[in-house]
Design a protein with these regions (language model features):
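Active-site cores that bind ATP or allylic diphosphates and position pyrophosphate for catalysis
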Residues: 124, 131-189
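N-terminal Rossmann-like or analogous alpha/beta NTP/dinucleotide-binding catalytic cores
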Residues: 1-149
Length: 189
């Protein structure tokens, strides 16, 4: 119902992307920049920590580009960022190595191209009762947040999680009416 086009399962992807055969203690680290501008000190700092950790443990350092915010995407930002990293001696073992260029067995390394993978896991969580669609608008969520802040209550649960216990029929009607939704985790605690 929520992901009708998704026919793969988490098991499929776990077979497609098996655990890496690395020595014990090796770390796989990543740098996941948004292509929204140039490399800045915060990027460089987190990237250097990930890179040094991977290299010190004979692990793998990869770059995965978080390109889901298309509104803020800056043309050429990926190339500029990779060039900036190379100035500091940071070169990925795998992942994005150029504008629209990738290497490695765990591709795709552009976040937007991994959508089906994430949706397969999301669908599995829903089927297990561990996630649910929330149809609350941004305005409704702002009102809920303001009410909770006034009462000094934290978190999105109980009476505030208005969509948590919708029936399958209610969910179906909302989806069929074109209502937008986001997926929320359903904690049993």
């Amino acid at each position: 119902l929520l992901f009708p086009n998704i026919d793969k399962t988490p098991d499929y992807y776990e077979e497609l992307y098996p655990l890496r055969k690395l020595k014990e203690g090796a770390r796989v680290t990543r740098f996941a920049p948004s292509p929204t501008g140039y490399l800045h000190f915060g990027n460089l700092y987190t990237c250097m920590a990930a890179y040094v950790t991977a290299k010190a443990t004979d692990g793998v350092f990869y770059v995965r580009v978080e390109d889901t915010d298309q509104k803020r995407k800056v043309d050429g930002a990926v190339s500029a960022m990779l060039k900036g990293l190379s100035v500091y001696g940071i070169v990925a073992d795998e992942g994005v190595i150029g504008e629209n260029e990738e290497k490695g067995d765990y591709a795709p390394y552009y976040q937007s191209a991994r959508k089906d993978i994430y949706q397969a896991y999301a669908k599995s969580l829903v089927m297990q009762g561990l996630a649910y669609p929330c149809f609350c608008s941004a305005e409704e969520l702002d009102e809920i947040r303001a009410s909770q802040e006034n009462e000094d209550i934290k978190g999105y649960y109980g009476k505030y999680a208005k969509c948590r216990n919708l029936s399958l029929d209610e969910i179906k009607k909302k989806i069929e009416s074109g209502a937008e939704w986001t997926l929320r985790l359903k904690s049993p605690g």
